[in-house]
Curated annotation (Swiss-Prot):
Residues 431-450 have a biased composition (Low complexity). Binds pyrazinoic acid (POA), the active form of the first-line anti-tuberculosis prodrug pyrazinamide (PZA). It comes from Mycobacterium tuberculosis (strain ATCC 25177 / H37Ra). Residues 1-10, 395-414, 421-430 have a biased composition (Basic and acidic residues). Residues 163-192 form a coiled coil. InterPro entries: DUF349. The lineage of its organism: Bacteria, Bacillati, Actinomycetota, Actinomycetes, Mycobacteriales. This is Uncharacterized protein MRA_2757.
Length: 450
């Protein structure tokens, strides 16, 4: 109480019956018991209540509050003017009313915690029966009851929303934990799965409002799943390292074998061997990228060395066969110009051409058949031209010559087969067969002569 404020005595005892008027006693009166004073808030214009309507002051200074429940003493005013007492206890009522109004506004605007507002309203309602104020306390009680009831509804709605939010947040973490467990159990795309687990953790950190015990259990699920994934991934790459080590050793052996074959001149067999080595290379799998690339360069260098040499040898052989074919073309041109009217001269010239033909050597398979066909046509032409006037000794000599040529080609075929030159052996056998047929034809002609 300030020096400028009249002293008053407030009582918080039970209100007496109106007929029992207290008698003043000499000496100081006890002051009011301490009660919580409503907090003052800066508010707009609020019409003050009329304390005269809800109270009275006895001649001895006793201040009475009048309410629906009756009258009760709220204090004693000994400082002079009763109007000052009405003003004092009226201001205290207005302060309490203002506090209740602010509570109501916070509740209506949603700026206050409904649970705290409800508790505050209940606490203030409990102080009304002993509040040292003059005013319409019944109206305040009704307002506090209304605030309490509405706060309870709002708090229930808030609680429902919180529970819904908690359920939704819990469901999100449940889904993330389940996804992490699925990745831990089945994922094989390790980088993608690892990135996703990190993204799950980032999202996890943004989810709040989950019950602590539930949150701890869900976190344990996620953490266990992440550990399981990391172990699986570690095991996978450890096994991959072991496999790559085995692949590396296998491919090193293939490289060594390829390098051994790179200088071979057995073109056919070595080509087949290189094809097998390449198939083995593809079946061996892959080592780590840098190792695999280095081994492949080594293998391919050996392979290229062999095939470059083979291609050069093949080109040289093909050039030789073309030259032989050109030489035999020239002999054929000479043979096809022979004058068969002088069959003795024609036969002699043809024998010389045949000897040169054999000395030239082989030609490519594509041209051999055509060249042989043309030569046999010339031989047939010369033979038929001379058959009319052959003598027996001449015919026998011719048949013997054919047999000798057949035996010569048979001998060449045997030598080629023994050396593994299959193609050359086949060609020699074909020539031997042709000459054998001519020898047999010549022998048949002798037997048919008169």
């Amino acid at each position: 109480m300030t020096a400028d404020e009249p002293r008053s005595d407030d009582s918080s005892g039970s209100a007496p019956q109106p007929a029992a008027t207290p008698v003043p006693r000499p000496g100081p009166r006890p002051g009011p018991r301490p009660v919580p004073r409503p907090t003052s808030y800066p508010v707009g214009a609020h019409p003050p209540s009329d304390p005269h309507r809800f109270g009275r002051i006895d001649d001895d200074g006793t201040v009475w509050l009048v309410s629906a429940s009756g009258e009760r003493i709220v204090g004693s005013w000994q400082a002079g003017d009763p109007e000052a007492a009405f003003a004092h206890f009226g201001r205290r009522f207005d302060d309490l009313s203002t506090e209740i109004m602010l509570m109501d506004e916070r509740l209506a605007s949603g700026t206050g915690d409904a649970r705290k507002i409800k508790a505050h309203a209940i606490a203030l309602a409990e102080t009304l029966p002993t509040a040292c104020v003059l005013g319409d306390v019944d109206a305040l009680a009704d307002r506090l009851t209304s605030i309490r009831d509405r706060a309870e509804v709002i708090a229930a709605a808030d609680r429902s929303r919180r529970e819904e939010h908690r359920a939704a947040q819990t469901a999100r973490k449940e889904a993330l934990a389940a996804e992490a467990e699925e990745l831990a159990a089945n994922a094989t795309q390790w980088k993608v799965a690892g990135d996703r687990l990190r993204a799950i953790l980032d999202e996890w950190k943004t989810i709040s409002g989950v019950d602590r015990k539930v949150d701890d259990a869900l976190w344990k699920r996620y953490s266990t799943a992440r550990d399981t994934f990391n172990r699986r991934r570690g095991s996978h790459f450890a096994e991959l390292d072991r496999e790559r080590s085995g692949v590396r050793q296998s491919k090193e052996r293939l490289c060594e074998r390829a390098e051994e074959l790179s200088e071979s001149t057995d073109w056919t067999a070595t080509s087949a061997e290189f094809r097998k080595l390449l198939a083995d290379w593809k079946a061996a799998g892959r080592a780590s990228k840098d190792v695999d690339d280095a081994l492949w360069r080594r293998f391919k260098a050996a392979q290229d060395s062999f095939f470059t040499a083979r291609n050069a040898a093949t080109a040289e052989k093909e050039a030789e066969l073309r030259a032989n074919a050109d030489a035999k073309e020239a002999l054929l041109a000479e043979a096809e110009r022979l004058d068969t009217t002088n069959h003795e001269a024609a036969r002699a010239a043809l024998r010389s051409i045949a000897e040169k033909w054999d000395a030239i050597g082989k030609v490519s398979r594509e041209r051999a058949a055509e060249l042989e066909r043309r030569l046999r046509a010339v031989e047939k032409k010369v033979r038929e031209a001379g058959e009319a006037d052959w003598s027996d000794p001449q015919a026998r000599a011719r048949a013997e010559q054919f047999r000798a040529r057949a035996e010569q080609f048979e001998h060449q075929a045997e030598k080629a087969a023994a050396a593994g030159r299959t193609k050359e052996a086949d060609e020699a056998k074909a020539n031997a067969e042709q000459w054998r047929q001519w020898a047999e034809a010549a022998a048949d002609a002798l037997t048919r002569r008169p």
